[in-house]
C-alpha cells in the first residue's frame, strides 16, 4: 500500500524521534526472509528493547539526515531494515547476530554508533558489548575488590595476632 504525503511525514518524524534516542543503529538486508520469520524477529526485538522498522530508503535518509546516523546514508541501497538499540548499545547487534545465525538471508550491511559508520563485520563487536546490568555488575565487582582485599588483610593480621597471643600466653602454676 502506497503512503500519502502525510503518512510519509509521520514515518519520517517517528523514525527521526527514535534515532535521537537510540544508542546504535544496524542496517541489514532482509530479502528472502519470510513474513513469519520477520514477525518472530519483531517480537524478539520488542522484548530486547530494539526498535525494528522496514522503511523506504528515501524516507530513512530524510529521517536520519539531522541525526548522528546521517553517516549511514551512503549504505541505503536495496531492501533494508533498521534496528535501533534503545536500551543499551549492543541490543540490536545481539538481535541481528542471533537471528542471522538461524536465517542466512539476513545480512547486516552497516553499523553506526556515536556518529561513526562501521562496516557490517562490526555487528559481532557490538553484540559482544555487555548489557547495562552486566556492565554495572562488573563495575560493582571492580569497586568492591579493594575493600574485599583490605578486609582479608585485616582478618589475616587479626588471626595471626590471636595465634601469637595464644602461644605466648604465660602459664600460671599453682603449687
From Swiss-Prot:
A Pfam match: Ribosomal_L10
Signal peptide coordinates: none
The UniProt record lists the keyword RNA-binding: yes
Transmembrane segments: none
GO molecular function, one term: large ribosomal subunit rRNA binding
Gene Ontology terms: cellular component: large ribosomal subunit
PANTHER family, A to Z: 39S RIBOSOMAL PROTEIN L10, MITOCHONDRIAL
Job description of the protein: Forms part of the ribosomal stalk, playing a central role in the interaction of the ribosome with GTP-bound translation factors.
Family: Belongs to the universal ribosomal protein uL10 family.
Record-linked HAMAP family: Ribosomal_uL10
Record note on quaternary structure: Part of the ribosomal stalk of the 50S ribosomal subunit. The N-terminus interacts with L11 and the large rRNA to form the base of the stalk. The C-terminus forms an elongated spine to which L12 dimers bind in a sequential fashion forming a multimeric L10(L12)X complex.
Protein name (record): Large ribosomal subunit protein uL10
